[in-house]
Design a protein with these regions (language model features):
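Anionic group-transfer/hydrolysis microenvironments
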Residues: 21-22, 52, 130, 253
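C-terminal regulatory/interaction regions
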Residues: 2-3, 252-272
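Core catalytic region of metal-dependent phosphoesterases/phosphodiesterases
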Residues: 2, 8-14, 23-119
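Hydrophobic, well-structured mid-protein blocks that either form specific transmembrane helices
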Residues: 120-128
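Structural motif
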Residues: 119-120, 221
């Protein structure tokens, strides 16, 4: 892989997929995200939902220069010829009211979902995925309550990592670790992955790319490729497609823990 060897080097991919950046919140790792966008370029950029956190608009709204920089970098890619597709999620659902109009704003296409054809000929369904989260669909109050608890966990995470940084330790997500320890959370993730894979299979796709649950993953589920591109709150991950059609999850936080700039491969799809 032609990874950046210095902060001034840019890597060109065929496609990049990012989601769950949650701009407008303190939890957003806009510094990592801006660095990623500065040092990568692509033909296709998919913003797979929860890019701006509309749930925080009325309270706890946070926006600094690094959040502005993220938007500037996305717009610069659109102006430079990158095909940018924005698929709103549940936290930026205010944009969904405009979906029937098929709008294109500043070179960015607004879509409910998208179909991506890889260079290797695989047809991928691209969607945020909240439609397959029963709590979000049928119990909005519980979803908001869960969002509040999650925000508290992330706030603790910030202070926890500030102490680690002063002690010379790298970034580590306590909230991600806790999520992996709770059996019900693990079961919920499994149900979500199966539901998305089943939807892709039902509609004749080779795979599905989604976000929503902040859990980067790439694996085959009953012959269908399931990919979650992760988030930019806890894990700072993105899905990239190389020019030969190979798909890879890149952990940008892990990359920035190193003294050299070589993305760590999280996973490749297991063979069926």
């Amino acid at each position: 892989m032609n990874a950046p060897s210095s902060p001034d080097t840019r890597t060109n991919y065929r496609s990049v997929f990012i989601s769950d950046t949650h701009l407008g919140t303190r939890g957003c790792r806009s510094d990592f995200l801006a660095d990623f966008l500065r040092r990568t370029s692509c033909q296709h950029l998919y913003l797979v939902g929860d890019i701006i956190d509309g749930w925080r608009l009325r309270k706890s709204w946070y926006w600094d220069d690094s959040h502005d920089e993220v938007l500037r970098l996305i717009l610069r890619q659109a102006r430079g010829g990158t095909e940018v597709t924005y698929i709103p999620g549940n936290h930026d659902e205010m944009f969904r009211q405009w979906l029937p109009l098929g709008l294109e704003i500043a070179g960015i296409r607004l879509r409910r979902e998208a179909v991506h054809l890889t260079a290797a000929g695989k047809r991928l369904l691209v969607m945020h995925g909240d439609e397959f989260d029963s709590v979000v669909r049928y119990a909005k109050f519980l979803a908001l309550l869960g969002d509040w608890a999650y925000a508290v966990a992330l706030a603790f995470n910030r202070y926890f990592n500030a102490i680690r940084r002063r002690l010379g330790y790298p970034y580590w997500s306590l909230s991600q670790w806790l999520k992996r320890q709770v059996k019900e959370a693990v079961k919920a993730i499994d149900r979500f992955e199966s539901a998305l894979a089943n939807e892709a299979r039902r509609r004749g796709f080779d795979g599905v790319v989604c976000g929503h649950i902040h859990h980067a993953e790439m694996r085959e589920v009953d012959g269908v490729l399931y990919i979650n591109d992760g988030d930019w709150v806890e894990s700072c991950t993105a899905l990239v497609e190389h020019h030969d059609g190979r798909l890879e999850l890149v952990d940008w936080a892990a990359l920035n823990r190193l003294s050299f700039f070589a993305p760590r491969r999280i996973a490749e799809p297991a063979t069926a």
